[in-house]
A protein has these predicted regions:
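Histidine/cysteine-enriched polar flanking segments
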Residues: 1-117
């Protein structure tokens, strides 16, 4: 899965396009081309005049589910459809991260491992 920005005037467009270009030329350890699943970026999410790093790729996979952040924007439904097509053996659950993203992270960030001290 790779994030893609369709709005050419968006500040992320160029970098994400370059990422896609690099990945498109990449192969796995067996010399096979990678299967690339494009995930559109959500429309910009702005809180208190600050654009926050909303991304659907901040998802979490568990044994039976996939928790996907959503942001109450037009792209949410399309992205959930893509996830459901890809993760056919897991329940895809949308989690509203509209407020959570203000902390500059979402589901995947919250579930990171804590090292034992």
């Amino acid at each position: 899965m790779i994030a893609v920005e369709n709005n050419r005037s968006d500040k992320n467009y160029k970098a994400l396009k370059e990422n896609l270009k690099i990945l498109s030329k990449s192969y796995d350890e067996n010399g096979k081309k990678l299967k690339i699943i494009k995930i559109p970026m959500p429309s910009p999410v702005v809180i208190d005049k600050t654009r926050v790093p909303a991304s659907y790729l901040n998802f979490f996979i568990s044994n039976k589910t996939v928790l996907v952040p959503v942001f109450n924007v037009k792209e949410d439904k399309k992205v959930l459809k893509i996830f459901r097509k890809f993760f056919t053996k897991r329940e895809v659950i949308a989690i509203d991260c509209s407020d959570l993203i203000w902390g500059f992270g979402a589901i995947h960030c919250m579930t990171q491992q804590e090292p034992k001290i």
